[in-house]
Amino acid sequence: MPALADKFAVNLKSERLRRKLSQEALAAKAGLSVSYISMLERGQRTPPLDTLESLAKALAVSPTSLLA
């Protein structure tokens, strides 16, 4: 897994858990499927920019914070 995708996966899950959200709740807030959230958190997918922005908005963080 590339370093950026690895960081994104870890940060996404960390931010979700910090907010005490289930994958289902995050998926609903971001307008995505639960299976897609799961794949992102496992580093099996890299989101396009619009999805990154949706996830950041749902988690109330900046998109760059999910990549750092």
PLM region spans:
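Residue-level marker of alpha-helix boundaries and capping positions
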Residues: 3, 14, 42-43
